[in-house]
Amino acid sequence: MEILRIEPTPSPNTMKVVLSYTREDKLSNTYKKVEETQPRFINQLLSIDGITSIFHVMNFLAVDKAPKADWEVILPDIKAAFSDANKVLESVNEPQIDNHFGEIKAELLTFKGIPYQIKLTSADQELREQLPQTYVDHMTQAQTAHDNIVFMRKWLDLGNRYGNIQEVMDGVLEEVLATYPESQLPVLVKHALEENHATNNYHFYRHVSLDEYHATDNWKTRLRMLNHFPKPTFEDIPLLDLALSDEKVPVRRQAIVLLGMIESKEILPYLYKGLRDKSPAVRRTAGDCISDLGYPEALPEMVLLLDDPQKIVRWRAAMFIFDEGNAEQLPALKAHINDNAFEVKLQIEMAISRIENGDEALGSVWKQMANRTI
């Protein structure tokens, strides 16, 4: 049995080890401590300092490490364990790409458009929080005897967030309460009880002018305006540019999200403002928008992010260079080859390898999918 390759996963604490051997029993096992009844190679891996558990299914292992353990120390020990036991090859093939490093997916559970629970999901963790009791009470008021609650409730995608999951939850809760103020709940209940309310796609979309937005003193109202904003056009850029200077992070982040919907090179200077924002969440969101748009003209700005203090931002920069970069970015990549975050270092190495091997820059996964439909 040999190691064919080692691949990063969306979780920074998990690596996928692909083997040359496929289990014939089609079963799966999770191992957390050394036991005599277990395969010898599993016990060897569990004996490595820093490894906390191993999941074995089909032809791969999912190896989990302690949060403070270092993959750069652990991976050579994993290879050595297989080499000692099976005399396998020392080399490991090029890792595959993790397109979602550091992301926390935020969702809002609603019933007939009335929100009552938040769910956050990262690669290795899920966190839920119920909204204040008044939201649950109004959701209950919206129910009728004929409603199928399980069928009619919906998870609304609130987009991705970045950072500590509990801090993200606190921020998302603040955003949701601003977007759906208690004063609006009776209106939502009234709408929910209307006879023709057969679908559960209720959402307010309302365009606001620059003057109306500028005249609003309450940041929660400004955020609500942006959250209920229809797909923006070029005429909305002055309003969104103003929102980029807002004192509140959720407002600036939502402005970036809306700017990213204007699929044109003309919005790049505004996204660059997001790259320089003091909040790493806004910087990463701006980087994600630029990556989705896939304009190589953004490469000089993204190269600068290789020096960002936050690894989730540096990783996005390295990923964009992998997707869109060329030989011009090699000096910058090599200057950052020893990044102290393993995930970033790995992505930089992959970008260098692709460029030096002369492989074509295919763009982001989103861009590749879009190109296939043309």
UniProtKB/Swiss-Prot annotation:
Q: Give the protein family.
A: Belongs to the CvfC family.
Protein name (database record): Conserved virulence factor C
Source organism (scientific name): Staphylococcus aureus (strain NCTC 8325 / PS 47)
State if Flavoprotein is listed as a keyword. Answer: no
What keywords tag this UniProt record? Virulence
Task: Sum up the protein's function in the record's words.
Answer: Required for hemolysin production. Contributes to virulence in both silkworm-infection model and mice.
UniProt entry tagged with the keyword Transcription: no
> Mind listing the GO molecular function terms for this protein?
oxidoreductase activity
Task: List the Gene3D superfamilies.
Answer: Leucine-rich Repeat Variant, Scaffold protein Nfu/NifU, N-terminal domain
